Amino acid sequence: MKVTFEQLKAAFNRALISRGVDSETADACAEMFARTTESGVYSHGVNRFPRFIQQLENGDIIPDAQPKRITSLGAIEQWDAQRSIGNLTAKKMMDRAIELAADHGIGLVALRNANHWMRGGSYGWQAAEKGYIGICWTNSIAVMPPWGAKECRIGTNPLIVAIPSTPITMVDMSMSMFSYGMLEVNRLAGRQLPVDGGFDDEGNLTKEPGVIEKNRRILPMGYWKGSGMSIVLDMIATLLSDGASVAEVTQDNSDEYGISQIFIAIEVDKLIDGPTRDAKLQRIMDYVTTAERADENQAIRLPGHEFTTLLAENRRNGITVDDSVWAKIQAL
């Protein structure tokens, strides 16, 4: 079914206010959920909202909490999110990283006691729109087996890198072949995954999203490489924030909350002039996209460039929402 941006935001806003979230906070949070969905990231927008409400009701998310700065070391700061609303706090932390970068050339904010930030790409994009390189990542509860194991002991720990090219070039990727949100999107659409995304119950690689959602044997991106990246990203976020690791979140908490996140902004213009920057980026993009195609009907894409098109389509035609997901939203 199709809904408008206004319908989405109103539904989110109503659910938040009915649970005691103050009107200003509810409006800002609903806006971010609606913008994420409008951008085409349904898995971490409308599809994720019922789970967000569940954590709000369980007390994992403290809606009136505000992040607090703990340590300041010039270009590096350490903050405590105090289990505040994840997407609003992440936006504030990237804004702070940008402010630090404006003074120092680079800014790094390490955040502890955070909640799920929903679409991580929003914060990389936020930096790139202002002309900065944006880098951020988060740890999570253990939802992926390390390479060679059956049992979940590492996080999907998504990493975002956004470049201020025209259009913005951005990688937003979990350390698994697919996020659990994308498994859900494909299952709801009745689609197999385009490539193997995990193991079935017999230990064979499978493209069936529902099987992987159930047994949680999701495949690390690049096999052992994604497994290793997940571990080191967790270590860095834990150390710099003095926060909880994947092991601590999984073993000590009843759900995924109190996680650790990193936000980095780099002011490119302190290192290279604008025309030179633009020319170098354009040459990279042209060199990649003019490679001989393996399939003449399949264009060579650059990461993140599809979001501008998706946003325009959703604004023109309405936002596609799965019927069952919309029913859940309406029932909240």
Swiss-Prot record:
Localization (cell): Cytoplasm
EC number(s) from the headed UniProt entry: 1.1.1.130
Tagged with keyword RNA-binding: no
Recorded catalytic activity of this chain's protein: 3-dehydro-L-gulonate + NAD(+) = 2,3-dioxo-L-gulonate + NADH + H(+); 3-dehydro-L-gulonate + NADP(+) = 2,3-dioxo-L-gulonate + NADPH + H(+)
Keyword annotations: Cytoplasm, NAD, Oxidoreductase
Active site per the UniProt annotation: H44
Name of the top EC class for this enzyme: oxidoreductase
InterPro entries hit by this protein: Diketo_gul_Rdtase (IPR023689), Mal/L-sulf/L-lact_DH-like_ah (IPR043144), Mal/L-sulf/L-lact_DH-like_NADP (IPR043143), Mal/L-sulfo/L-lacto_DH-like_sf (IPR036111), Malate/L-lactate_DH-like (IPR003767)
Single GO MF annotation: NAD+ binding
GO cellular component: cytoplasm
Binding locations of NAD(+): I168, T169, M170, V171, D172, M173, S174, W224, K225, G304, H305, E306
Family: Belongs to the LDH2/MDH2 oxidoreductase family. DlgD subfamily.
Subunit (UniProt): Homodimer.
UniProt-listed PANTHER family: 2,3-DIKETO-L-GULONATE REDUCTASE (PTHR11091:SF3), OXIDOREDUCTASE-RELATED (PTHR11091)
Protein task: Catalyzes the reduction of 2,3-diketo-L-gulonate in the presence of NADH, to form 3-keto-L-gulonate.
UniProt protein name: 2,3-diketo-L-gulonate reductase
Lineage per the UniProt record: Bacteria, Pseudomonadati, Pseudomonadota, Gammaproteobacteria, Enterobacterales
